[in-house]
């Protein structure tokens, strides 16, 4: 997804890389009543977001950036590799209709967690594997899930599990990118429970 030249996007020129207290603070947004947030980094957020859109009980998804040192980064800033941000999807889910465990299962199935700072052809720290938790229960479930999956893997899982930090919503162009048609204008289904293969194209 590193296609800055094709999209006409680049670094905003932000040179002050002193850690921002805002960027390193907690995510202070509030989910809807009866809902909870979760954050996952699993490579390019386009395909990851579509996968979570299809989960029954997921009420909202947003592509964005987190875990960095710069306040309000642009896509260009993040792709420069100098801000420390990860591309993530923030998922809002109904606690009565969706379990955190089901979100974790989808997370593991969507990417190779044994590659460091890379998913397929996408290379950079922004593509690292990460689970960013909002509650002690989420942390507990995430760590238990990692341990179970590690037993099934020959290579070491590189996924980081950290507290959720400030979430920066990505530019509108990136939101629900594949369901809106992507580069070729061919929208992909967001129907709940849909198992159609996800085609990620820029």
Curated annotation (Swiss-Prot):
One of its GO terms (biological process) is response to light stimulus. The modification Phosphoserine is found at residue 189. Optimum pH is 7.0. It is found in: Cytoplasm, Cytosol. Its EC number is 1.8.4.11. This is Peptide methionine sulfoxide reductase A3. Residues 1-34 are annotated as: Disordered. One of its GO terms (molecular function) is L-methionine:thioredoxin-disulfide S-oxidoreductase activity. It catalyses: L-methionyl-[protein] + [thioredoxin]-disulfide + H2O = L-methionyl-(S)-S-oxide-[protein] + [thioredoxin]-dithiol; [thioredoxin]-disulfide + L-methionine + H2O = L-methionine (S)-S-oxide + [thioredoxin]-dithiol. Expressed in rosette and cauline leaves, and at lower levels in roots, stems and flowers (at protein level).
């Amino acid at each position: 997804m590193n296609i800055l030249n094709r999209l006409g996007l680049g670094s905003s020129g932000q040179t002050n890389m002193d850690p921002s207290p805002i960027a390193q603070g907690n995510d202070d947004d509030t989910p809807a009543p009866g809902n909870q947030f979760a954050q996952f980094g699993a490579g390019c957020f386009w395909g990851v977001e579509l996968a979570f859109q299809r989960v029954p009980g997921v009420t909202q998804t947003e592509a964005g950036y987190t875990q960095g040192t710069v306040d309000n980064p642009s896509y260009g800033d993040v792709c420069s590799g100098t801000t420390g941000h990860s591309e993530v999807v923030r998922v809002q889910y109904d606690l009565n209709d969706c379990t955190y465990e089901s979100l974790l299962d989808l997370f593991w199935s969507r990417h190779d967690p044994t590659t460091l700072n890379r998913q397929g052809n996408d290379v950079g720290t922004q593509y690292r594997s990460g689970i960013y938790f909002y509650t002690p229960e989420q942390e507990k479930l995430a760590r238990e899930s990692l341990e179970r999956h590690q037993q099934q893997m020959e290579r070491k899982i590189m996924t980081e599990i950290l507290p959720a930090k400030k979430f920066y919503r990505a530019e509108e162009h990136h939101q629900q990118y594949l369901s809106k048609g992507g580069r070729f204008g061919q929208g992909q289904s967001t129907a709940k429970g849909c198992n159609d293969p996800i085609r990620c194209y820029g």
